[in-house]
């Protein structure tokens, strides 16, 4: 009986973690399109790009060095928690990732 309960608890916990990871990725994608897409679009004030523009280590460096601030400070536009979701989305789908996404903003 205890073995079954432990197994079910572990299974449910695993499903919740996977669901949370998938939801986080979707949030990052949605934020990338809605927030970054305000400027990074065809005819926009910034160039169009996709997650595969850089390798994951390059995205890490981009955010660590706050390179976006050189052109425009986005801290007043995109809160830090949303920036973290966007960063994770870009890293998860970078050129060297297991799930690269070439579709960019339009």
Give names to the regions the model predicted.
Residues 14-31:
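Electrostatic cytochrome c docking/interface patches
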Residues 33, 60-63, 87, 91:
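Non-transmembrane alpha-helical segments in soluble domains
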Residues 45-48, 97-99:
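Inter-heme linker and motif-flanking segments adjacent to c-type heme-binding CXXCH motifs
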Residues 76-106:
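C-terminal capping alpha-helices of c-type cytochrome domains
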């Amino acid at each position: 009986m205890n073995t079954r309960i432990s197994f079910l608890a572990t299974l449910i916990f695993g499903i919740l973690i996977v669901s949370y990871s998938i939801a986080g990725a979707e949030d990052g994608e949605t934020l990338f399109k809605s927030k970054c897409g305000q400027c990074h679009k065809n005819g926009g004030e910034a160039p169009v790009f996709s997650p595969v523009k850089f390798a994951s280590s390059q995205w890490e460096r981009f955010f660590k060095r706050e390179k976006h601030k050189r052109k425009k400070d986005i801290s007043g536009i995109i809160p830090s928690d949303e920036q973290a979701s966007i960063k994770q989305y870009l890293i998860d789908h970078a050129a060297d990732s297991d799930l690269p996404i070439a579709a960019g903003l339009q």
